[in-house]
């Protein structure tokens, strides 16, 4: 039986079913079939692949559009079988379809396009960026990725609820918000949720107020002063329960976020990338956990420029003729970029040399965000070198201070 160097598999990922095409490096398509996103569908997929591997020999390479999305857990199962996994760059795939259009458009045609991309990469080096091999990542970084994304979703939910609750409070009970500088304060939320009826808060005695968690004599005095002039709108009877429900949900979210951060702290201590990021002044636990989770492994980046583009700290040349300009890249991890922007802003306030560079960029007419990204471009070089060498950040004295 003839042997080949590789069995190539292309998967067009859908919501409930995926379209699969299996072929050889010669371009021959061996089989096409649909795969249900169920355990029995996964078993059928691997049975088909293993049958062709026994027949033709060689390794198995699997390419899928939508890695780490709707394809989960199929992508994890592919890697657990020892197959090489490639992520199809969907933007470059769209450009490929424009250059080599098909007669029609359906899932099976898209799956065959994946096999064509394999062949194109063999003969055209510039096309290798279309198929990006997925590097193995440490388990702790995979866990950090899921936990930090979960935390971010809860933080955003808390922000939405706070905005809604404050607007409802301002309408239903004018003046109540003035007793606190932040509606997210624990004592204020405990005060709101003490009773099922919002209007009863105006009649609570001082002894009852002091029994509420977080309220001492200072806050009790503020509440007592508000009670003397408390006023409720006509719709407080049905808006009040909504406010109390939102306040209780915010308390639940606070506890859930705190628990996630504690879990992240334990994983950061095990992650080499997170430890390195955490050693940079200004990059705290949350920033280090988010960046480590989104990067996964530094092995996926060929150089520091690739890392900078991925984290949104670098622009692409967009010059033509005498025009000199740049544009923002589209392949940016927005979560990693957000964590970098927060960490860099805190970093420059703690490191005088970074602050001087930031002020230099502002003096050149750059906006705050542009100056932060310019500083982040330099930090990406430092981070890439740190992670490659397994070193932590070293804060050294400036030359003029040593002299």
Stretch-by-stretch model annotation:
Residues 1-403:
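A detector of single, family-specific signature residues
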């Amino acid at each position: 039986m003839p042997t080949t160097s590789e069995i190539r598999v292309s998967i067009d990922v859908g919501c409930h079913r995926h379209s699969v095409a299996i072929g050889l490096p010669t371009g021959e398509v061996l089989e096409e079939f649909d795969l249900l996103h169920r355990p029995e569908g996964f078993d059928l997929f691997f049975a088909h692949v293993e049958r062709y591997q026994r027949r033709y020999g060689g390794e198995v390479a699997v390419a899928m559009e939508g890695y780490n999305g709707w394809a989960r857990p199929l992508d994890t199962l592919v890697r657990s079988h020892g197959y090489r996994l490639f992520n199809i760059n969907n933007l470059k795939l769209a450009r490929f379809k424009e250059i080599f259009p098909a007669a029609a458009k359906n899932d099976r045609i898209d799956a065959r396009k994946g096999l064509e991309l394999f062949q194109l990469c063999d003969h055209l080096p510039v096309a290798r960026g279309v198929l990006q091999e997925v590097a193995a990542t440490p388990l702790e970084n995979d866990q950090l990725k899921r936990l930090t994304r979960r935390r971010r979703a809860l933080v955003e939910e808390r922000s939405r609820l706070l905005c809604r609750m404050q607007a409802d409070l301002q309408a239903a009970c004018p003046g109540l918000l003035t007793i606190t500088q932040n509606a997210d304060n624990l004592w204020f939320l405990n005060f709101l949720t003490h009773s099922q009826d919002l209007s009863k808060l105006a009649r609570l005695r001082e002894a009852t107020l002091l029994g509420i968690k977080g309220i001492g004599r200072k806050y009790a005095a503020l509440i007592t002063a508000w009670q003397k002039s408390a006023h409720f709108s006509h719709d407080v009877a049905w808006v009040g329960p909504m406010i109390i429900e939102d306040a209780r949900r915010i308390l639940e979210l606070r506890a859930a976020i705190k628990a996630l951060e504690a879990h992240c702290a334990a994983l950061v201590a095990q992650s080499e990338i997170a430890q390195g990021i955490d050693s940079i002044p200004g990059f705290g636990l949350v920033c280090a956990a988010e960046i480590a989770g989104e990067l996964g492994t530094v092995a996926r980046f060929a150089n520091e420029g690739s890392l900078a583009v991925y984290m949104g700290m670098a622009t692409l040349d967009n010059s033509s003729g005498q025009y000199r300009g740049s544009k923002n890249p589209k392949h940016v991890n927005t979560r990693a970029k957000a964590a970098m922007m927060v960490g860099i802003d805190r970093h420059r306030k703690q490191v005088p040399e970074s602050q001087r560079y930031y002020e230099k960029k502002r003096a050149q007419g750059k906006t705050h965000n542009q100056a932060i990204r310019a500083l982040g471009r330099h930090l990406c070089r430092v981070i890439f070198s740190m992670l490659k060498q397994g070193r932590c950040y070293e804060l050294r004295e400036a030359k003029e201070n040593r002299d």
